[in-house]
Amino acid sequence: MPTEDAYPELQEEEIDVEAELEKLILEDREAEASTSSGEASAEASQDLSETLKQLQQELEITRQQLKEKEESYIRLYADFENYRRRTQREKEEFSQKERQKFVLEILPVVDSFERAQQQLKLETDREREVHNSYQSVYRLLVECLKKMGVSRMKSVGQPFDPNLHEAIARQPSSEYPEDVVAVEYQPGYKLGDLVIRHAMVAVSSGSPTSEPSPSDPATPKPEPESTPASPQNPQHS
């Protein structure tokens, strides 16, 4: 019976077959491993894609919510600004009305001081003393009104303006042309830019004329002298 060493070519062939078989087995295992790894990679990629898609959806939802919150904040801020401005305006209007009410109560006192000043005759020391006392109080009142934003309007010599003046008379004037304020009976005042009291004035109707007005009585004209009729002579028969 021949031994294994008797057929060395068979031994080499067997070795080659075994080597080839081992190689095929190794390749098969690598292929299986590669296939398994590819499947795992595909599954991981699919999971990652789904996770990314979900995160994108959540990000879009978050962005939409943020946009809604921003719009809500803008509306709330605008409402607050409107409320603040309205409150400030109402506060200023109330303060303006209160100042106007106070000034209108003070102005008659100022008028009284000015009338007294015009009527007072400074002939004695007592009269001058009273005048100085009046003037001190008058100056305090005027200064107080100035600090509140009150100013006296100039009327005489100004064109008549119904927004500033109240005409109570119309009279001829040699100094001022027609429709110009000629006399001021009571001064007008402003509180800031607001007219709080119109000036009571007389408006010029133009230069006076020497022609008699229609109401003047007409001067009777002299009648022509009549010639007396001569008496008739009686007829004698």
From Swiss-Prot:
<comment type="function">
    <text>Participates actively in the response to hyperosmotic and heat shock by preventing the aggregation of stress-denatured proteins, in association with DnaK and GrpE. It is the nucleotide exchange factor for DnaK and may function as a thermosensor. Unfolded proteins bind initially to DnaJ; upon interaction with the DnaJ-bound protein, DnaK hydrolyzes its bound ATP, resulting in the formation of a stable complex. GrpE releases ADP from DnaK; ATP binding to DnaK triggers the release of the substrate protein, thus completing the reaction cycle.</text>
</comment>
<dbReference type="Pfam" id="PF01025">
    <property type="entry name" value="GrpE"/>
</dbReference>
<dbReference type="GO" id="GO:0000774">
    <property type="term" value="F:adenyl-nucleotide exchange factor activity"/>
</dbReference>
<feature type="compositionally biased region" description="Polar residues">
    <location>
        <begin position="227"/>
        <end position="237"/>
    </location>
</feature>
<dbReference type="GO" id="GO:0042803">
    <property type="term" value="F:protein homodimerization activity"/>
</dbReference>
<dbReference type="GO" id="GO:0005737">
    <property type="term" value="C:cytoplasm"/>
</dbReference>
<dbReference type="GO" id="GO:0006457">
    <property type="term" value="P:protein folding"/>
</dbReference>
<keyword id="KW-0143">Chaperone</keyword>
<dbReference type="InterPro" id="IPR009012">
    <property type="entry name" value="GrpE_head"/>
</dbReference>
<feature type="compositionally biased region" description="Low complexity">
    <location>
        <begin position="33"/>
        <end position="45"/>
    </location>
</feature>
<dbReference type="InterPro" id="IPR000740">
    <property type="entry name" value="GrpE"/>
</dbReference>
<protein>
    <recommendedName>
        <fullName>Protein GrpE</fullName>
    </recommendedName>
</protein>
<comment type="similarity">
    <text>Belongs to the GrpE family.</text>
</comment>
<dbReference type="GO" id="GO:0051087">
    <property type="term" value="F:protein-folding chaperone binding"/>
</dbReference>
<keyword id="KW-0963">Cytoplasm</keyword>
<keyword id="KW-0346">Stress response</keyword>
<feature type="region of interest" description="Disordered">
    <location>
        <begin position="27"/>
        <end position="51"/>
    </location>
</feature>
<dbReference type="GO" id="GO:0051082">
    <property type="term" value="F:unfolded protein binding"/>
</dbReference>
<comment type="subunit">
    <text>Homodimer.</text>
</comment>
<feature type="compositionally biased region" description="Low complexity">
    <location>
        <begin position="204"/>
        <end position="213"/>
    </location>
</feature>
<dbReference type="InterPro" id="IPR013805">
    <property type="entry name" value="GrpE_coiled_coil"/>
</dbReference>
<feature type="region of interest" description="Disordered">
    <location>
        <begin position="202"/>
        <end position="237"/>
    </location>
</feature>
